[in-house]
Regions:
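N-terminal Rossmann/SDR dinucleotide-binding element
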Residues: 1-41, 158
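NAD(P)H-binding glycine-rich loop region in Rossmannoid oxidoreductase-like domains
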Residues: 27-64, 98
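Glycine-rich NAD(P)-binding loop of the Rossmann-fold in SDR/ketoreductase-type enzymes
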Residues: 41, 60-68, 107, 115-116
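Conserved Rossmann-fold NAD(P)-dependent oxidoreductase catalytic core, especially the SDR/UDP-sugar
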Residues: 44, 70-112, 130, 136
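Active-site segment of SDR-like NAD(P)-dependent oxidoreductases
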Residues: 48-52, 90-99, 107, 141-144, ...
Length: 298
């Protein structure tokens, strides 16, 4: 999070002005932007987010996710911005075996990424008590899919998430490695909870409205509540792109099961994921790939 993009939204337009401000060297520029556009709320989506990279370079993750978030919070508070929504992660949870993760489940991150996000959650809880700022942390599970109505020219495409990697592998007629197929899951492969990016966007708006009307701090799981295995993803991609070559590789030291209990978000935020079935997620990802690679949709 070396810089922050500020986008001002109005009902009469899709998006208003966009500003690129360097953090922390030019954080004073936030004062002018906040005052000029009378900003009273912030949805904070920036940060570093790779689990593997976080263990190799934890300093970067604590700087971007903790130190710079604190700098941003302090500036917002100084300018009387009293509503803050933070993108946290399911990586804050401990290994929960085959059980759903509830907000009350043990938080014991196994990587620096999760630890950095959990640290910010603690900060938000303390800040909401000490200062006039209401905070919500949204614990994202596996965000996937695309807004196929967006203009791909303005968005970078990098296949670094599982579904995108499988689609890219299929188009290249390469072989996809499945790391482990003897886990105690329905088909032996890792299971994750995939939630469509458009449902996540809706959750942020719901959280923002909640923040404006409720004092203090809250956290919510944002997932689909649907367990999907790696093999099921491969099968779904094959429905669009045909047979994918696979091979089984040794299991890696990773969490093999992650699933959200989203009861709290449903009841308190009145949020329900509408686009997060795996067929809709994969279909949007295939279409996005074809849009960005100038190929017809299969």
């Amino acid at each position: 999070m070396e810089s922050i993009d500020i986008i001002w939204h109005k009902k009469s337009t899709a998006f208003g002005p966009s500003f690129d401000i360097d953090l922390p060297t030019n954080i004073q520029a936030l004062d002018d932007v906040i005052k000029r556009y009378n900003i009273d709320s912030c949805i904070h989506l920036a940060g570093s987010s790779s689990v593997g990279a976080s263990n190799k370079n934890p300093a970067l993750f604590y700087k971007n996710n903790v130190a710079l978030t604190m700098a941003l919070l302090d500036k917002l508070i100084a300018n009387d911005v009293n509503t803050f929504v933070f993108s946290s992660t399911a990586s804050v949870y401990a290994d929960n075996d085959l059980n759903k993760c509830m907000e009350t489940s043990s938080a014991l991150p196994s990587n620096a990424y999760g630890s950095s996000k959990l640290a910010v959650e603690s900060i938000l809880k303390d800040y909401s008590k000490a200062y006039d700022i209401n905070c919500v942390a949204l614990r994202y599970f596996n965000v996937a899919g695309y807004d196929i109505e967006a203009d791909p020219k303005n968005i970078r495409y990098k296949p670094n998430k599982l579904i995108d990697i499988i689609i890219d592998t299929a188009h290249r007629h390469a072989t996809f490695k499945i790391f482990g197929n003897t886990y105690p899951t329905k088909d032996g492969t890792c299971v994750r909870d995939y939630v469509h990016v458009m449902d996540v966007a809706e959750a942020n708006l719901k959280a923002l409205n909640y923040c404006r009307e409720n004092k203090g701090y809250q956290m919510f799981n944002i997932g689909s509540g649907i367990p999907t295995s790696n093999l099921e993803i491969i099968n779904e991609v094959q429905r669009h792109l045909g047979k994918i070559n696979t091979e089984i590789a040794d299991a890696r030291n990773e969490l093999y099961y992650s699933l959200a209990d989203i009861t709290k978000a449903k009841e308190i935020l009145d949020w329900t994921p509408a686009k997060s079935s795996i067929d809709k997620i994969v279909a949007s990802a295939v279409k996005w790939y074809n849009m960005t690679h100038k190929k017809e949709i299969q």
